[in-house]
A protein has these predicted regions:
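Hydrophobic alpha-helical membrane segments
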Residues: 1-337
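Conserved, mostly hydrophobic/aromatic
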Residues: 340, 358, 369, 404, ...
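A cross-domain feature marking catalytic cores of carbohydrate-active enzymes
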Residues: 341, 368-370, 437-439, 470, ...
Length: 588
């Protein structure tokens, strides 16, 4: 193991320039042409289904369209091929080193043939399963440039960790996924090097290579990671020190732009080195005698150095332009901070105590969920079944209001009682805080459900001052038709493509599906956009510097505190920690 680590580090140092040149080109092509090809197919999928975007509202009709399914298959086929091709080229670079790459038309034809052979039949599903399996760990493993921005949506993990059983399930699954990732760590390198292998065979062989104590060979690479992290840290520290020396705490435009560009370059190079080193180390685990081609002549090396210089200038120019635009922007102004079900750290979700805590913390709105009881009363609750908070298997939509109002609810050491929508609104008026009401239809509602809600809003005299949203698009659009004064919104937990409705006033979109392009489109159409559920310090800081209109959070106090810190425009060290999602270090 030590011998392999030394060999990998020596190889990286000896061929660093050619590796940087070739792998930078590969990453650039994958994240531009490859990503564009995938987005183009995605657009074809949406057009073929006659919808502007896919959400949880239309996913059934989306997946029952034969043409859509056919194009979706092509999309996944192209995705898996691009991942396979990327790793094939990475291995080719490691084997060729300074020698000339034999990447011509024949090479792509050959790789396409071997790819199709390796995923034929059910092996295609095995490949997709493998890619999905790696998503929780793309930051820690050798992953494709096309997959590095993927992660488990927070609305899935966030809901799970709110209960003890959920935490056990979440961390248990994480541990199982981590174990399988370690056991299948050799699968993709095996698939691209052993060209006659089917992918499931590669999975099986990887499982064999990591049996027993052999799994510790993979963990031994941690020493190389520490070396790479140390180098990145030293270079970053030098950049921080130089920027602080030149600029102090003023953050002038040009110094800030250069600082952002330098940090991006260091992190980009570090990621490339990590990917190459880890892949090279894995190859030595089963293919130590890999063929290596003859080195090129000295004059060719000079040409490569010129090409490397040119490439760095191009990438550096793009990087500088991007960061110049970023540096010219500023934090969001007048950002709405919306307490998610009140403030759950200070009380049971959707309780009066939680509402009061959100108001004291300075929330712009407090979000709550309401469900209609069997006898037509709106009850404040996120779940139709009350077992999670009451311990009793009672369903709101099948119960009389008098039988459930006042039930004791418990969560995270807090206690309260189930209350009506009317009592909740009365308390909000007393506290001087507005509400964001989320309608939670269960399927048991009467035909006049939306009219009942509109009438209730008018009765409480809050129809024009509160925000109302629902994940059921038909419900919220009907509410808007019944009373145009109500500020209505669509709750979106997952979305691909454009917004599916222009009839609402705002969108509340989950963090996983948010991007700045969607925000700009919403604003161009006169709509607002809110993001949920933003809880970590890094996510809060990131969204405070986007064009979103507001964040829905469990930690209202944290958002207000971080707002003040960003407004103070502190040191370059703080700036660096925010850029690299390492702000938590300051709290150690």
């Amino acid at each position: 193991m030590i011998k392999d680590i030394k060999s990998v580090l020596k190889d990286l140092n000896q061929h660093k320039y050619i590796y940087v040149l070739r792998i930078s080109i590969l990453q650039f092509l994958m994240t531009t042409i490859g990503a564009y090809g995938l987005s183009l197919i995605l657009r074809v999928i949406l057009i073929s289904s006659n919808i502007p975007g896919m959400t949880t509202d239309n996913i059934v009709s989306f997946l029952t369209n034969p043409l859509t399914l056919a194009v979706l298959f092509v999309y996944f086929l192209l995705l898996t091929f691009l991942v396979y091709l990327e790793f094939s080229l990475l291995v080719e670079n490691i084997e060729c080193k300074e020698a000339k790459l034999g990447v011509r038309l024949f090479y792509f034809k050959e790789r396409s043939y071997h790819f199709l052979k390796s995923i034929l039949g059910w092996h295609f599903l095995a490949f997709l399963f493998y890619l999905i399996l790696t998503i929780p760990f793309v930051e820690f493993l050798v992953s494709s440039a096309l997959l590095e921005s993927l992660y488990i949506p927070n609305f899935i993990s966030g809901e799970l960790v709110k209960s003890t059983n959920g935490k056990i399930i979440y961390f248990g699954l994480y541990a199982i996924f981590a174990y399988f990732n370690l056991r299948f760590i050799y699968a993709l390198p095996l698939a691209v090097t052993k060209k006659d292998n089917r992918f499931a065979v590669a999975l099986k062989e990887s499982w064999w290579l990591t049996r027993g104590t052999k799994i510790f060979r993979v963990l031994g690479f941690a020493s190389v990671i520490l070396i790479i992290v140390a180098i990145i840290s030293l270079l970053s520290a030098a950049g921080i020190g130089l920027a602080a020396l030149v600029d102090g705490c003023e953050k002038t435009f040009w110094v800030e732009t250069l600082f952002l560009s330098f940090i991006w370059g260091v992190l980009f190079a570090g990621r490339l080195v990590f990917k190459l080193a880890f892949l090279s180390y894995l190859l030595k685990g089963f293919d130590d005698e890999a063929s290596q081609k003859l080195p090129i002549k000295e004059n060719k090396k000079q040409h490569r150095m010129l090409a490397l210089t040119g490439l760095l200038l191009v990438i550096g120019g793009i990087n500088f332009t991007y960061n110049a635009l970023k540096a010219s922007g500023g934090p969001s102004k007048n950002l709405s901070v919306i307490g998610h079900r009140g403030m759950v750290s200070q009380g049971v979700e959707n309780s009066l105590e939680s509402l009061e805590a959100a108001a004291k913390a300075g929330a712009t709105y407090s979000e709550l969920d309401i469900i209609l009881s069997k006898d037509g009363h709106f009850i404040v609750s996120h779940d139709d079944n009350l077992k999670r908070l009451t311990g009793k298997n009672i369903t709101i939509s099948q119960s009389q209001a008098e039988d459930i109002l006042g039930l004791k609810i418990k969560q995270n050491g807090h206690e309260s009682h189930l209350i009506s929508f009317e009592d909740y609104v009365a308390k909000a008026k007393q506290l001087g805080i507005k509400l964001l009401v989320e309608l939670k239809p269960t399927g048991n509602e009467p035909d006049n459900y939306e009219q009942l809600f509109v009438d209730k809003m008018k009765e409480l005299h809050v129809a024009s001052s509160y925000l109302v949203m629902s994940s059921d698009l038909k419900t919220i659009e009907k509410v808007k038709r019944l009373d145009s004064a109500i500020q209505s919104g669509h709750t979106i937990s997952f979305q691909l493509g454009d917004f599916t409705s222009q009839k609402v006033d705002f969108y509340a979109i989950e963090d996983f599906s948010y991007n700045e392009l969607l925000a700009r489109k919403a604003h161009q159409n006169g709509k607002k956009i809110y993001v949920w559920t933003i809880n970590s310090r890094d996510d809060i800081e990131r969204y405070l510097e986007t064009s979103t209109d507001g964040v829905i959070t469990d930690y209202t106090t944290s958002v207000r505190k971080i707002e003040k810190e960003l407004a103070a425009d502190d040191s370059y060290l703080d700036y660096f920690l925010r850029l690299t999602n390492l702000s938590w270090i300051e709290k150690l």
